[in-house]
């Protein structure tokens, strides 16, 4: 069982002006898939705060999988992908590509996602859309291969990608 964190990135959620439904929904999905969700937070759309939370989850807490929800769109304050890429050491472009492909099957607006994913130390970080529906569709599109990716990340070289 791998540890996981869910970070909701929302100015209104942080200020208590909007109820976060995406974060708790992602927590439930992760638990159903066998993850141990050990950390959750709600932070504003502030680049430095996003980076600090991601680094904390990776470097201090040693969490295997970190999901963010929110801040991946076109609004001027949507800077989650940029903050994540500031601290990611090894990009994993196939994950957001798969999420966008699945989203495009549902709506042409799926191409507007700016989600990114990558590895920092031994933590896989995936940025998801802010809506409950889109974040659920996106994570369900990739969670099974992500679990295998974590097996490889934690295997010390003994896991086979072809399996």
List the model feature ranges, each with a label.
Residues 1-163:
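Non-catalytic beta/alpha edge segments that cap or flank active sites
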